[in-house]
Amino acid sequence: MTSKNPIQKALYLAFERAQWSVLRDAVPMTLSEQDLENLRGINEKVSLSEVTDIYLPLSRLLNLIVKSKQQRGLVLDEFLGQKPSSSPYIISIAGSVAVGKSTTARILQALLRHWPEHPKVDLVTTDGFLYPLADLKRKGLLQRKGFPESYDMKMLVEFISAVKSGQAHVNAPIYSHVTYDRIRGQHQTVSQPDILILEGLNVLQTGLDSPVDIRRPFVSDFVDFSIYVDAEEHLLKQWYQERFLQFRKGAFSDEKSYFHHYASLTDDEANAIAAKIWDTINGPNLQLNIQPTRERAHLILQKGQDHLMSHVLLRK
C-alpha cells in the first residue's frame, strides 16, 4: 500500500510492523487482556500483541512530543514573566466509518494515562456534535448524516477553542448510538486535561474544505497531533457489513433503537441493506470528504486484513 502513493513517499517515513514495534524501547505493557476486552469495539479483533507492536511505540512517541511541548510552554511562561499556563495537548483521530477509530482512541487514552507527565487524558467523540435528529430531518440531511454539513461546526469549534484556551470546565454533548441522536440534558464535562483526544470523521478538515467561508477556524486549527486510521475501501465496506450484522443481533434488538426495524432481517437482507448504506452514504462520504484529508495527518496507521495494522507512516 505504501509504495503505490508517491505523495506519501514524499511526506512520510514508512515503517513496516516489525520495524515500528522495535521503537517501543522497553515501554512496559500496562493493559491486561480484560482491559483490552473492555476497550474493543464491535467486530474489532485487536490483541495484546497489536498493542505491543503498534500502540506502545505510538504512546512512547506521543509522550516524548507532549513533554517537549510542555517544556516549550514553561520556557515561554518564563520569558513572559507569567505564571505557568495550562493548555491541553490535543490529539485528533480521523478515518472512515468502521475502520476502528473509537477503539484506537480508547486504547491510546488508556496507555497515555499511565505516563506520569500527563495522567489526565480525556476522550471526546465528534458524534455528539451532529445536529439533533429533528434538525437533520427538517434540513433534509438525514441521508447525509456524517457528511460535513450534518455537524454543528460552530458548536464543535467553540468547544475545542474553549478547551484549548484552558477554561476550567467545558461541556460536550453526548450521542446515543441506540436512539441515533444526541441525549437531551446530558453532557460530558472536560476539565483542563493534560491531553484531549478528539475522535471523528471530520477532524482533519480545514477551512479549504468549507463551501461557506474558508477563513473561519476549523477543528484542525487547534490540533497538535493528528492520526488517520486507514484501510482499503473494500475492507472498510466488508467491516461495515460485518458490524451491521453484529448490531442487528445486539443493539438493534433493543426496542428503543432507532434501527429496531432491522432486527428481524435475515442475513442476506441485512447484508444487502448494509451494502446499500455503504454505497450511497458512507462510501461517497469517504471518497469526497474523509480520505482526501488523509495526507494532512502527522501519522497514518494502515490496516490490512482482520483489522491488523500493517504499516505506520510518520510525517518527516
Curated annotation (Swiss-Prot):
Species per Swiss-Prot/TrEMBL record? Shewanella sp. (strain ANA-3)
Protein known as: Pantothenate kinase
GO CC term, one of those recorded: cytoplasm
**What subcellular locations does the record give?**
Cytoplasm
Q: Its Enzyme Commission number?
A: 2.7.1.33
Regions that span the bilayer: none
One Pfam family from the UniProt entry? PRK
Q: Which domain of life is it from?
A: Bacteria
Q: What EC class is this?
A: transferase
- Say which family it is in: Belongs to the prokaryotic pantothenate kinase family.
- InterPro entries, sorted: P-loop_NTPase, PanK, PRK/URK
The reactions it catalyses are: (R)-pantothenate + ATP = (R)-4'-phosphopantothenate + ADP + H(+)
Annotated GO biological processes are:
coenzyme A biosynthetic process
User: What does the record give under GO molecular function?
Assistant: ATP binding; pantothenate kinase activity
Give, as in the UniProt entry, the pathway in which the protein acts: Cofactor biosynthesis; coenzyme A biosynthesis; CoA from (R)-pantothenate: step 1/5
Instruction: Write out the entry's keywords from A to Z.
Output: ATP-binding, Coenzyme A biosynthesis, Cytoplasm, Kinase, Nucleotide-binding, Transferase
Q: Which residues hold ATP? A: G95, S96, V97, A98, V99, G100, K101, S102
